[in-house]
Amino acid sequence: EQFRELFLDACKIRMRSDVTLGTGLSGGLDSSATICAMSYISRNCADERANKDWQHAYVACFPGTDLDETKYAKQVTDYLGIRHTFLTIDDAVPEREFLRQLYCFEELWGNPQVPMMELYKKERELGTTVSLDGHAADELFAGYGFDVLKAYPDAKGKAEIDQITMAYLNQR
């Protein structure tokens, strides 16, 4: 319950805006939770300063790949009754654009940020100037198995090491 209140409060604060709000929606837990929180705040906090023009979901689509979560994102937008914009991401990004994005991020990531950059570009083209997104929830809650292993250096004793090991094994 405490996490829920903190999460809703964090979203509510970020919805204070006098410009159009949107969100990058993948259909995963983090972005779905964010847009559902925005919907909840809009319905239940009418007297607050939260922006009422937030119903814009932008979805990066990767047809025919394991990365495509379009059907999950559509379920969320249908459930909430909000607009969605689907943007098919072309895997043949020009070299110049790829290099520009590398320059912007100043580092090489395990996966290029091309989809995110293209999605934000589309948001801007369609009039959304602020995007409230759910990035990094997987990392925050150890959604990736390898993140659990990062807890080993902080373990105090065998009991905590065993707990970390069990958390890792239970994810697999």
PLM features per residue range, with description:
Residues 1-172:
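ATP-dependent adenylate-handling active sites, centered on carboxylate activation for C-N bond formation
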